[in-house]
Amino acid sequence: MNQGTPHIVLAGGGTAGHVNPLLAVAGAIRDIEPTAQVTVIGTAVGLEKDLVPEAGYELDTIEKVPFPRRPNLYMLRFPAKWKRETAKVRSILETRHADVVAGFGGYASAPVYATAHKMGIPIAIHEQNARAGMANKLGARWADFIGTVYEGTGLKPRAGADVERVGLPLRPAIASLTKRIGDDRAAVRRESAAQLGVDPNRPLVLVTGGSLGAQSLNRAIASSAADLLAHAQIIHLTGRGKISEVRELVTASAGADVLTGIGPESAGQGDYHTAEYLERIDLAFACADLVICRAGAGSVSELAALGLPAIYVPLPIGNGEQRFNAEPVVNAGGGLLVADKDLTPQWVHEHVPDLLADHERLAEFGRKAWEYGIRNAAEIMARHVLQLAEPSK
């Protein structure tokens, strides 16, 4: 350690799924050890480009070095590019006097892992997905500590490495909400409902397919508006460019009078609240009795940490990665899993109203989700990173 002050380099980025956990751990490190010097290695094109400086951390950038997946011209160029970027990483780690490197996956992580290993710098890894990505699979060969959100990620740690399910380091707004609802969920619900323009005394279903929306989810739910509104009010976040179709389907099902927006001015105007996107998703989480959503790793972990029952509809692409994200909490009793192809208006009609009417079953889903969820992942991960920075390590 550098004269009693730990110098910690965090690596990762590209998507919010990599950047948000990184920043959560960075904040926890500073909370535990205010003297710690924390910097980040990322790319100049990922979300970290803006989010890291905005959070108050210095960002050192390298170019993306994705591993070749098939024989092509890039495969021929890869060795030279890898050598150039790892040399740049070595310079950064030397300049930053790094005591430990902690990686969160993404393009920037792989060259950092390889370089830190050659320099003898301890390595910690956080893997957020049920099936690990290529960068973290590489880093696991050399890591001293691996923190995961799921069991069975496919990572193969070296002999002697510590591996622990630590959970997902939560975004500040979500971490704050977990503490507040633990103290007084009803009060938090009332305050949040006032800001959204919804009734805190009526059940609420939150529907979201992410920032881009989910067409199949949008159509199945909006077409079932009349069935659902008999049991609950709805907040439907449609995704960009998809709100018109959703409103048309709702109108066809339940009439135009049920439609309204989101915000205090919408109170009492209708029970089907629509918007393309909601910046303060924590407000909707605070009011929700049931969430119908995709099964991204971040979404699943946040809903479990909040103890929210959910119907997960995995994105039907790749090797079914999203299904693997949702299966553990569903198997623990924290919700339902339905394939995208099966989510039809008929499925909604046959399953969701009965679930909303069964308050005991819904409450049990919530209890099981809460028991499965982990709310202090950022602190756990931060303590492991700081431990690796100690001279004895």
UniProtKB/Swiss-Prot annotation:
Principal EC category: transferase
Catalytically driven reaction(s): di-trans,octa-cis-undecaprenyl diphospho-N-acetyl-alpha-D-muramoyl-L-alanyl-D-glutamyl-meso-2,6-diaminopimeloyl-D-alanyl-D-alanine + UDP-N-acetyl-alpha-D-glucosamine = di-trans,octa-cis-undecaprenyl diphospho-[N-acetyl-alpha-D-glucosaminyl-(1->4)]-N-acetyl-alpha-D-muramoyl-L-alanyl-D-glutamyl-meso-2,6-diaminopimeloyl-D-alanyl-D-alanine + UDP + H(+)
Keywords tagged on the record: Cell cycle, Cell division, Cell membrane, Cell shape, Cell wall biogenesis/degradation, Glycosyltransferase, Membrane, Peptidoglycan synthesis, Transferase
Entry GO MF terms: UDP-N-acetyl-D-glucosamine:N-acetylmuramoyl-L-alanyl-D-glutamyl-meso-2,6-diaminopimelyl-D-alanyl-D-alanine-diphosphoundecaprenol 4-beta-N-acetylglucosaminlytransferase activity; undecaprenyldiphospho-muramoylpentapeptide beta-N-acetylglucosaminyltransferase activity
UniProt cross-references to SUPFAM superfamilies, sorted A to Z: UDP-Glycosyltransferase/glycogen phosphorylase
EC number: 2.4.1.227
Principal place of residence: membrane
Any one GO CC term of the record: plasma membrane
Biological processes per GO annotation: carbohydrate metabolic process; cell division; cell wall organization; lipid glycosylation; peptidoglycan biosynthetic process; regulation of cell shape
Pathway: Cell wall biogenesis; peptidoglycan biosynthesis
Membrane topology: Peripheral membrane protein
Residues the entry annotates as binding UDP-N-acetyl-alpha-D-glucosamine: T15, A16, G17, N129, R171, S211, Q322
Compartments, as annotated in UniProt: Cell membrane
Domain of life: Bacteria
Function field: Cell wall formation. Catalyzes the transfer of a GlcNAc subunit on undecaprenyl-pyrophosphoryl-MurNAc-pentapeptide (lipid intermediate I) to form undecaprenyl-pyrophosphoryl-MurNAc-(pentapeptide)GlcNAc (lipid intermediate II).
Family affiliation: Belongs to the glycosyltransferase 28 family. MurG subfamily.
Family annotation (HAMAP family): MurG
Name of this chain's protein: UDP-N-acetylglucosamine--N-acetylmuramyl-(pentapeptide) pyrophosphoryl-undecaprenol N-acetylglucosamine transferase
Native source organism of the sequence: Bifidobacterium longum (strain NCC 2705)
